[in-house]
């Protein structure tokens, strides 16, 4: 079976702003299947932003489950993330899903992994997907050495990742929340 792979999702938190951005490329082995996929979206009445890396169908399943958890817990990001992770670990059908979610609201940011882990990032920075290490390095350098806004850092770091990672392109979707 052919596997869809590759993407880059980056989240940066700076001052009263949190931004998640992602590229638009969907690849199957060495073929670009789509260049303008939307892997970042707003959830729960525009109070939460989220991005995914991994299998597209798997990620949409997780988005739906995560949004249901947000509704159930009235937008409490931490509780929704932990409850989704519990389900992910205990539900056999979910355990087979291959995706990572990066989620954020005004207060917190998390990576929710396929192992059922909920990870709060260091430095207010999340980078997942095939181009994640490149985007993370670029974003960290920009965070430490410039006064750029979180949005500018996300855009520049994703552009750098796209120059390096063959599974990442420059068709970006960027969402932000400001406090």
Swiss-Prot record:
Annotated Gene Ontology cellular component terms: HslUV protease complex; proteasome core complex
Pfam families on file: Proteasome
PROSITE patterns cross-referenced by the UniProt entry: PROTEASOME_BETA_2
Reactions catalysed, as given in the entry: ATP-dependent cleavage of peptide bonds with broad specificity
Subunit annotation: A double ring-shaped homohexamer of HslV is capped on each side by a ring-shaped HslU homohexamer. The assembly of the HslU/HslV complex is dependent on binding of ATP.
Coiled coil regions in record: none
UniProt name for this protein: ATP-dependent protease subunit HslV
Upper taxonomic lineage: Bacteria, Pseudomonadati, Pseudomonadota, Gammaproteobacteria, Chromatiales
Segments traversing the membrane: none
